């Protein structure tokens, strides 16, 4: 859980204390998930945990990037680079950024998998800001822009692992309407019962 600075302390001390606590929690999570991450295949071993609470979907994704921490944070600190990453997903149609005094205004346009003009897609408006950036810990957030409470919050943190590797943690939440929860539960109870992500599990497979 990412912490904010506590009241009653000097601003610099508050930020440093919160960053130290968050880094310690990220390191503890990594040690717990390391066996799963190290078993992963591909260029970026990945572990995803999801849960639901009061109709809200909560997700945590952890990945090991085979790139030095300095290069990773250099890329992530600039919101414009997010517009090179996020549209790689098939549902993302476009991404724009505009500088603001409180951070960078970032707009994502999401729609159906097939071709769809950005003007027909749904816009999610965010303010992107970096909370912490030092040699051992990085944290940033995408928060709903003023007047757009429907944009789900996203928090990102990273830390170096050594050996030119970087641990990335993305936390997100999403509140869905009742009709969509019923439809989703019905799908995963029937047609999607053997699916994890995009993969179909074999009958004898174990979920790790």
What are these regions (language model features)?
Residues 4-12:
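C-terminal segment of classical bacterial N-terminal signal peptides
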Residues 15-42, 46-47, 52, 143-145, ...:
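Terminal "cap-and-tail" regions of soluble proteins that handle hydrophobic small molecules
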Residues 15-105, 111-118, 208:
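Hydrophobic ligand-binding cavity/cleft-lining segments
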Residues 56, 91-153, 160, 173-175:
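Glycine-rich portal/gate segments that line the openings of hydrophobic small-molecule binding cavities
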Residues 62-64, 129, 157:
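Generic structural detector for well-ordered beta-strands
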Residues 79-80, 120, 188-191:
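Surface-exposed flexible segments
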Residues 86-90, 99, 121, 130-134, ...:
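Glycine-rich loops and low-complexity Gly/Arg-rich segments
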